[in-house]
């Protein structure tokens, strides 16, 4: 890679980190906001996808923020393991991708943090919920019209 491209990549990386840091404190229970200049709500899908960037850059404030998001999701998880669509609202359910995203980011966070048992009980409940989302028992989770994306 040329020096010019290297510089462009580094500038993009720094800009992304600045956005993530800007979004650290939103108006809902000290959780990050979804979009710094748009949606203040802590949408699970968006924050977990942003969590990939938080873990990749290794910034301690971003890693700690992801931990808070995961802990809040675990507290707001349904008895059967479904993860809500809004991090802070246990009644906002219906998304089919929030629970698998929770499991993915939880596994990655555990590895980065060196905490293999972090949120073990919520992880087991989430896996149980996932099992019941595969009607044919062939591991593949169903995407039914009633559990479709709402945006």
Tell where the protein language model's regions lie, with residue ranges:
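Aromatic-rich carbohydrate-recognition surfaces in CAZymes
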Residues: 41-47, 54-144
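A short, charged helix-loop
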Residues: 146-151
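Low-complexity, Ser/Thr/Pro/Gly-enriched N-terminal "stalk/linker" regions
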Residues: 1-42, 65-68
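Short alpha-helical segments and helix-capping/turn motifs at coil-helix boundaries
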Residues: 35-36, 49-52
